[in-house]
């Protein structure tokens, strides 16, 4: 019998790196809402009292970047110096944006395929490799460790916003270790929550007593509600529960650590359970295959698992800048496939159009911000881009495609 423990982590929206992801995607939403053809590559940096946005944007949209950045930071919860040491109203906002390079633009605007098909004329915005993954460990076909870590992080933010625990501050991290037997989750080994908090908790000032109170409240208001509908639940007697292992977490957010866009790519995807091509998502418009092709790869993998063609699937795609069709497609079912991996790969090549233009069209990636009232990508920037049950994501809806694949068996 094979036994092992696998661990994944998540972070809350108030984590410095996640602030940056949300700022970058808020800029993307604003540009695409007014001009769906906008080319955006927006990076953000936060530090004590500072938010810088930089990168390349070519767009007809008129955006008040200063106002937008402050609104994002304020909505996260950094409304004053007492809300974690970072203040949306008084922090400096610096904007240093250029236009997209004409050399890159020509490859995206007119692919090298010399085809009359409009979808062949949208080239990949860069070279690169992307991975998509799905497995049958959860209803949303995600690995259990990252699914649980996101549940806890979302719940941690919710109880803060709703003041169910009134001493919590925006920065926080979760980590979940799951025990497996023969590749199947069998128990939750460890839950770790690090959460920023006020220096005084309901009149308690002794550090040891504060941490005991926080641990008690987090189990009651975060862990139990976040896992109540799961068949595999943490057990108070056997699941190790760690809270703020350093002893306290008062200094946090950008005051405690600098943040950068794109530094939580494993949190954004599969929690380390599957491979990653290295490209971040946030702040990138859909012509960047780092983002759009990773979404498509997830769609392919999830459809294959939903169609019961395999219990676990990883899909690799690769692209060349300025070329529409993928350079390569590879499917790995880890020995769980109903047919061989080569047959699954051929099936993907035959049944999925993975040109950037086709992906953008199928998921309506350029129009989603305006369709959703000016905000879409920003909502993907915290708590993962895959397996979401709280927001509607087109690459997660595989029901129709899974039916079509089932008929091909």
Swiss-Prot record:
Gene Ontology MF term list: ATP binding; magnesium ion binding; methionine adenosyltransferase activity
Catalytic activity from the UniProt record: L-methionine + ATP + H2O = S-adenosyl-L-methionine + phosphate + diphosphate
InterPro entries membership: ADOMET_SYNTHASE_CS, S-AdoMet_synt_C, S-AdoMet_synt_central, S-AdoMet_synt_N, S-AdoMet_synthetase, S-AdoMet_synthetase_sfam
Keyword GTP-binding appears in the UniProt entry: no
UniProtKB keywords: ATP-binding, Cytoplasm, Magnesium, Metal-binding, Nucleotide-binding, One-carbon metabolism, Potassium, Transferase
GO cellular component entries: cytoplasm
Pathway assigned to this chain's UniProt record: Amino-acid biosynthesis; S-adenosyl-L-methionine biosynthesis; S-adenosyl-L-methionine from L-methionine: step 1/1
GO terms of biological process kind: one-carbon metabolic process; S-adenosylmethionine biosynthetic process
Residues holding K(+): 43
Amino-acid positions noted as binding Mg(2+) in the UniProt annotation, renumbered to this chain: 17
Keyword Transcription: no
Cofactor names: Mg(2+); K(+)
Domain of life (superkingdom): Bacteria
Residues that, per the record, bind ATP: 15, 171-173, 248-249, 257, 263-264, 280, 284
Main location, first listed in the record: cytoplasm
Cofactor note: Binds 2 divalent ions per subunit.
Residues that bind L-methionine: 56, 100, 257, 288
Region named Flexible loop: 100-110
Pfam families in the cross-refs: S-AdoMet_synt_C, S-AdoMet_synt_M, S-AdoMet_synt_N
Subcellular compartments: Cytoplasm
Record-linked HAMAP family: S_AdoMet_synth1
Family (UniProt): Belongs to the AdoMet synthase family.
Subunit description: Homotetramer; dimer of dimers.
Function: Catalyzes the formation of S-adenosylmethionine (AdoMet) from methionine and ATP. The overall synthetic reaction is composed of two sequential steps, AdoMet formation and the subsequent tripolyphosphate hydrolysis which occurs prior to release of AdoMet from the enzyme.
PANTHER family in UniProt: S-ADENOSYLMETHIONINE SYNTHETASE (PTHR11964)
Protein name (Swiss-Prot/TrEMBL): S-adenosylmethionine synthase
Species of provenance: Prochlorococcus marinus (strain NATL2A)
Lineage: Bacteria, Bacillati, Cyanobacteriota, Cyanophyceae, Synechococcales
